[in-house]
Amino acid sequence: MKEFDTIAAIATALGEGGIAIIRVSGNKALEIVNKIFRGINGKDLLDIKPYTMRYGHMIDENNEIIDEVIVSFMKGPRSFTAEDTVEINCHGGIVATNKVLQNVIKAGARLAEPGEFTKRAFLNGRIDLSQAEAVMDIITAKTELSMKSAMTQSQGRLSTEINNLRKEALDILALIEYAVDFTEDDEEPDETIPVKVKEDVITLRGKVNNLIDTADEGKLIRDGLSMVIVGKPNVGKSSLLNALLNENRAIVTDIAGTTRDVIEEYINLDGIPVRLVDTAGIRETEDVVEKIGVEKSKEKINEADLVILMLDTSRELDEEDKEIIDYIKDRKYIVLLNKVDLDRKLSSEIVDNLENKIELSAKTGFGIDDLKSKIKDLFFNGSIDAESVMVTNTRHKEALYRASENLDGALNGLNNNEFLDLVSIYVTSALRALGEITGAELEEDLVNKIFAEFCCGK
């Protein structure tokens, strides 16, 4: 375990609440907190047993009571950071919590940097980097499904998979080294070794690519699906948004162009976090405010994972509808034929040629379940398993791509009968790329950058 100074930070969300927790970690954690703790009957903290709690008060330099607290003690390495850790349970609230923290710092602790507690857990070998990143994913999870996926990663399932792949890469390198040593000793080379190396590289590349194939689904589970609702004004976009949200979030009127700006909301679609974007229409307009909304709509369409095109079945297709269809036709889309509860007037060969059509009444809710099923079919083949090993982090995906590309390079070298020691350069690069995922191979600056994105107190 590495030697660090003692750090402290508020571990709970800042604001009014029943209880707040101040976390203190480091070799002097107990000694520092003891300086400002007064237990019942004069008891201090120096004789506290690990994994127990003690009731008392926090006091300032004038021996005045700051707050009533319960203090717990976790002895390293059996703690989150693998260091001695003290947690002060005090009353919630900005003033009370900050007052306790200020006195902990006065007593000798340093204010922790964002993510520094988790960083210490990583540097002390308690967790690897992918597990550390999963901690933040647990905190930011928007649905139970994304929570389960993050929990699976935090328990080391992905780490185990990556470590197994690294072992296979090391075995390939050992085989290459064995063959190269034979050549250097002027012994007759074993002609079966290049064949075995090639087979192993192909197998390893296949496993790496299988993980890459999970990345798109994994990213959607972690970050959510970006879905844009688009259509001409008053086609029912806001009504659809409200139907999906089960509340009147958007203004619904008979006046075209009422939604003048982009409206964004999150919904839980059977465990998938979906960021719904209700846009202004994209018609030509002279209204300056509406024109800004139209430009924002086009930006959101270009950024979206899925476009929901709404058409009004109670009206004929017009030029504005055709303009929208032309704009979104090369993207992944679903066509909602809205207002089927009214007399149908929509009839067009253009519409007939569109894919993924669903009849809907946003007003009555008819067709909403069909829409949800279609979304799952398009992105998850109809089923989702958050407990299987999958790649949810873009950094991990990029590292896997580099590993796969280097294994491609190794395979090309083998096919061209290049020297095995040249092939080993590609395999070594693949090994390092895989190591970046768990932190086994990573520059210190990048490690610092990753943990800097964490919240304080974690």
From Swiss-Prot:
E.C. designation(s): 3.6.-.-
Cofactor annotation remark: Binds 1 potassium ion per subunit.
Keywords, sorted A to Z: Cytoplasm, GTP-binding, Hydrolase, Magnesium, Metal-binding, Nucleotide-binding, Potassium, tRNA processing
PROSITE patterns in the cross-refs: G_TRME
Amino acids binding GTP: 234-239, 253-259, 278-281
A Pfam short name: MMR_HSR1
Disulfide-linked positions: none
Cofactor (UniProt): K(+)
CDD domains for this protein: trmE, TrmE_N
Annotated binding of Mg(2+), by residue: 238, 259
Single GO biological process annotation from the record: tRNA methylation
Matches recorded under InterPro entries: G_TrmE, GTP-bd, GTP-bd_TrmE_N, GTPase_MnmE, MnmE_dom2, MnmE_helical, P-loop_NTPase, Small_GTP-bd
Residues annotated to bind K(+): 234, 253, 255, 258
Highest taxon, organism lineage: Bacteria
UniProt domain TrmE-type G: residue ranges: 224-380
A GO term, aspect molecular function: metal ion binding
Compartments where found: Cytoplasm
Positions bound to (6S)-5-formyl-5,6,7,8-tetrahydrofolate: 23, 87, 126, 458
Main location: cytoplasm
GO CC, alphabetical: cytosol
Record function comment: Exhibits a very high intrinsic GTPase hydrolysis rate. Involved in the addition of a carboxymethylaminomethyl (cmnm) group at the wobble position (U34) of certain tRNAs, forming tRNA-cmnm(5)s(2)U34.
Matching HAMAP family: GTPase_MnmE
Subunit text: Homodimer. Heterotetramer of two MnmE and two MnmG subunits.
Sequence similarity: Belongs to the TRAFAC class TrmE-Era-EngA-EngB-Septin-like GTPase superfamily. TrmE GTPase family.
Name of the molecule in the record: tRNA modification GTPase MnmE
Lineage: Bacteria, Bacillati, Bacillota, Clostridia, Eubacteriales
Gene: mnmE
